[in-house]
């Protein structure tokens, strides 16, 4: 990552930190910076059914993830495997819908390739590109290995 959390907090009024792709069981941490927190956020969240009843579970996960840089180490693994996936897709001649340095890669697939790849890998429909192509999302996580990328390369 080329920005620190304190720098991000200076640049934003609010941001969130995802947990599941870094190994958390569930949850995201919403961070309000400075004086930008809304009035009474917890009751508002509860009223809309978006608060885990046992919120301590989510908090403990983030406490562990931010100990000794674990969150960033895990995130780096996801991004490195996503970039390896990107290279494989590029080598196979696939076009990218978006340029992204993250753990998510958005690829324009011929519809028949999408059907075939889905038999071997988990990909997410993103949007219809044209009559014969679809944009899909490939997403890596803390658990994605080079062996996973190699297995997908064999399918491609």
What are these regions, as identified by a protein language model?
Residues 2-3, 108:
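N-terminal hydrophobic targeting segments
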Residues 83, 88-156:
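Conserved C-terminal alpha-helix-loop-beta "cap" of PLP-dependent enzymes
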Residues 3-92, 97-102:
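Active-site C-terminal subdomain of aminotransferase-like
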